[in-house]
Regions:
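Conserved glycine-rich FAD pyrophosphate-binding loop
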Residues: 41-42, 46-47, 72, 79, ...
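A conserved active-site cap/scaffold subdomain adjacent to cofactor or substrate pockets
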Residues: 236, 242, 291-329
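Short amphipathic alpha-helix segments
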Residues: 248-284, 375-391, 425-432
Length: 489
């Protein structure tokens, strides 16, 4: 059952929170609350009663304890609203905005690790890491202003997945729904620094972290975590392969992934390629629309990093492999002379969905995991549903993120729409989501409609999740909209 705080209890919570963290950090202005009530997803809007912005672990702990006692629902938020519906609150609930907790607490250069708070953005982490000869792994769909910690916790697709894998967050500090502080892995032990590698930067956290991965704020608040950083190599080059056949795309992507050379890799259809490579100017929407028809069906983009002689060998190997299947390795994308420069810049400081949304006004994402070999049939099915609903294929973007498991990819299908086209998109989105599931898609981050689709088909899995939820959060205060089959969407 979803807990909904009564007006009296919410008012008492606001009073207690104001005393704990100061009036200026408890926001109740209607215009500000409205900003947090919706995003580009199809999740039903919900206006919070207030926004609280704690500045320390202790303040977060106090806020959670008050909410638990007064049965006031809390929705954690780290880096601004997203476009998947995960941070839309229960009506009259509370937004726990963690953006004031924006410090890089520690760094272990030798281990390639940094300890960060949830308010640290990718832009901030990248700038900090670069001073130490390191770099952060960045997300494909999210902007540089997103929270690094929550992105890694949510296992959102990263450009670097193809080489470095999905688990970038290691040990962490969690505040449970009753305010109890819990530390995973070696963070639970006393800290040991030089001459040894920082013990808290150890990548070994056991299986406990998996409880909070992709938990969508339903099982507590991650207030700090150690994340992996990667070296800045001597040579960094970007390369492209353009493809016009779905079946060839599978062969090309598989061969490149199998070689284990790319350090960052992504595949765009012509729509998302145009959105990605077009400069963000006042005429962005018009120029993007003009660019889409001129682009190849697919653009495979990746980086090669290392010493010069090593990169030269990798380039030669990939070019030879592609030549064997009738394709060329390109330095630029035809018709886009700045593609290399833009790709390298975006991998470091991504623009993400806020930029892409300027094409038509909004961008509704359908994210899933699937087998690389299923991409051709999934893409063909997608086109059929687009045509059935009278939606233009020039409005539907597809971005594929390869993983380090050759044959497994993350897909984002993006319905670029006008703000008022919610009802038009809803039926198309639902039918496509059902068909993708039938064809082998797995919704690892199920929000809104996707949660109902997944959990209703995996009752045993859902019951295990609910057992964990009832154990850790018996009062159901933490983001209660996320784990439900009955939410009015």
């Amino acid at each position: 059952m979803v807990v909904r705080g009564t007006i009296m209890l919410v008012d008492k919570f606001i009073d207690l929170a104001s005393k704990a963290i100061g009036d200026t950090n408890v926001i109740t202005y209607p215009k500000e609350l409205e900003k947090y009530s919706r995003d580009h997803s199809l999740v039903k809007p919900g206006i919070p009663s207030c926004i609280v912005r704690p500045g320390s672990v202790e303040e977060v702990q106090e806020i959670i304890e008050y909410a638990n006692k007064l049965l006031v629902p809390i929705t954690p938020l780290s880096g601004g609203t997203n476009n998947l519906g995960g941070t839309i609150p229960v009506p009259n609930g509370v937004i726990l905005d963690l953006k004031r907790m924006n410090r890089v607490l520690d760094i272990d250069v030798r281990a390639g690790m940094a300890s960060i708070q949830p308010g640290v953005t990718f832009e901030q982490l990248q700038e900090y890491a670069s001073k130490h000869g390191l770099r952060a792994l960045t997300p494909v769909e999210l902007p540089k202003t997103s929270s690094a910690l929550s992105t890694y916790l949510d296992l959102a697709p990263l450009y670097g997945w193809v080489y470095y894998g999905e688990e970038i967050l290691t040990t962490m500090t969690v505040l449970l729904p009753d305010g109890t502080l819990l530390k995973t892995g070696q963070q639970a032990f006393p800290q040991i620094k030089w001459p040894y590698v920082h013990s808290h930067a150890s990548p070994f956290a056991g299986l406990m972290n998996y409880i909070w991965y992709q938990s969508q704020g339903t099982l507590g608040v991650v207030a700090q975590g150690w994340v992996k950083l990667k070296p800045i190599h001597e040579v960094v080059e970007a390369f492209f392969v353009t493809v016009n056949d779905d079946n060839d795309l599978y062969k090309i992507a598989r061969e490149i992934m199998w070689m284990r050379y790319p350090r960052d890799m992504v595949i765009f259809n012509n729509v998302d390629a145009a959105l990605f490579f077009e400069d963000e100017t006042p005429n962005y929407g018009k120029k993007t629309a003009e660019l889409i028809p001129s682009l190849p069906k697919w653009v495979v983009a990746f980086t090669l990093r290392g010493r010069k002689e090593g990169v030269d060998i990798m380039v030669s190997d990939i070019a030879e492999k592609l030549q064997g299947i009738g394709y060329k390795l390109l330095d630029e994308v035809p018709g886009m002379p700045k593609a290399k420069e833009i790709f390298l810049s975006e991998v470091n400081y991504p623009s993400g969905w806020p930029k892409y949304s300027k094409y038509r006004g909004a961008r509704t994402i359908l994210p899933f995991i699937c087998s690389l070999k299923d991409v051709p049939i999934i893409h063909q099915a997608l086109k059929k549903f687009i045509e059935k609903h009278g939606f233009s294929t020039n409005y539907v973007g597809v971005t594929i993120t390869p993983t380090d498991r050759v044959g497994v990819v993350a897909c984002n299908v993006a319905f670029n729409r006008e703000i008022q086209e919610v009802d038009k998109i809803r039926n198309l989105y639902y039918e496509v989501a059902e068909e993708m599931l039938r064809l082998g898609a797995f919704y690892s981050r199920p929000y809104g409609i996707l949660a109902k689709l997944m959990y209703s088909r995996a009752q045993n899995y859902y019951e295990v999740l609910m057992k964990i939820k009832r154990t850790l959060d018996p009062n159901n205060i933490m983001n209660p909209r996320r784990l439900t089959l009955t939410e009015d969407l």
